[in-house]
Amino acid sequence: MPLPRSLFSKDAPQDHDLRVVSGQWPDALSGELVLSAPHPDTLSGPHPFFGEGMTYRLSLAAGTHGAGPETFAWRQGRIDSPSARLRAKRPDVFEATMIGVQSPFGHTNAANTAPLPWGDRLFMTWDVGRPVEIDPVTLGYLGDVGHRSQWKDFEIAPQPLLPLVMSTAHPVIDPDRNVLWTVNTHWGSLHIARWDGEGAVEQWPITGAIIPQSVHTITQTRDWLIVADCAFKVEPQVLAGGERTEPANHDGPVYLIRKDTL
């Protein structure tokens, strides 16, 4: 099916107080629906993947977060990360390319792909950057996960302030160990990364494990991590509702890694 035209709109995001106009809202429904997307005014360049991260939150209970007693709060905010602040100050030196938004400062960390809750904390993620923590109430930026020295930079140009970190857009929270598992690939070599939420990011190289392209998702069982190459292929006709014609690589690697061996 074709993508909705609203995805290509560059209208400025706004807060709204929404009303139910048909049917009845379930009384027992509560909580928050959190979405991630690129900001529409940064969708320039070869494709929209590198637009700066936005957070959208719909409260599922009426009368919260400033909404009236019969309305539901739709709130949004741009992630005010260091790269977003630098780009706002000097937009003239940032250039969207096929491998990211580059500048003399380094590469932007868009953090525009997926929300990741961890207890009462909230992180926003992306394939080509460290996970970013935001305040789940104010949606304000709190910090990137780990110091840049704890990650392996994919340095194809000088990156004095903004490192390019090849990670995954979908890390996982381990409920048994209360840690975050992710990856850090470096020139094709696979490293597993673990973070306890407070200290330094730990990493282990996986001997012989090669990632031809990138790792979009890491998943888990109680004892194992599962990592696969995403083998992403761009097919422009899909955007217009056409069928995919390129199959996934039949030889794309999948790695099963025991957690207790790290």
What residue ranges belong to the model's regions?
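Short, conserved, GDST-rich strand-edge loop motifs in beta-rich repeat architectures
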Residues: 38-44, 230-248
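Entry beta-strands of beta-propeller and related beta-repeat scaffolds
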Residues: 29-35, 120-123, 177-181, 224-228
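Residue-level signature of beta-propeller blades and closely related beta-rich strand-turn architectures
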Residues: 39, 61, 128, 186, ...
